[in-house]
């Protein structure tokens, strides 16, 4: 059976003003700033809030390059591998799509976004003015999405502390919905003799909550309600 591999971006994009008073795009991850050239930024942006296979990255990059007429200096493979080496892209592998998804998300820390209001506003304008989509249809962008039980639990826990997907799974397994302080959190997650930050993802993978939580995290990410960090 062929091993399946999935990829996504971690961190967040910001613009900073340099010493020449010029705006420069940077990527923030784990409290550090990373510079990226145009090709790398295109690939990172392609994978931000998306989960793709290797071949999908190639197809998406080809579409963007053709549409923009941008002349590339390096291959997309070189750019992608450099981003993986720098930790700005991450991958997960497994025998099944779900195994690859869990391997990808299990150790990533989750940060809720404040809600992509301006992104939705820009999309609304684009749909109504440029694509001539009826206002009644475009208005659906602003309708509050209903979250599933597990999506709501993920957001509640992620809003209280910086937790990985695996740590959230263990919290839900232990019926923990409130995190009073860091000491109580660490005791709940790592108070036994076997669990460590290195093995928690493998230890909770077979738990009852593992699959619904992992799928909830993936869906929240694809709906741009969370971003991923690496600590």
Predicted regions and their residues:
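Hydrophobic, helix-prone linear segments
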Residues: 1-13
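N-terminal ordered "arm"
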Residues: 10-42, 47-48
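Long, charge-rich, low-complexity alpha-helical segments
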Residues: 34-231
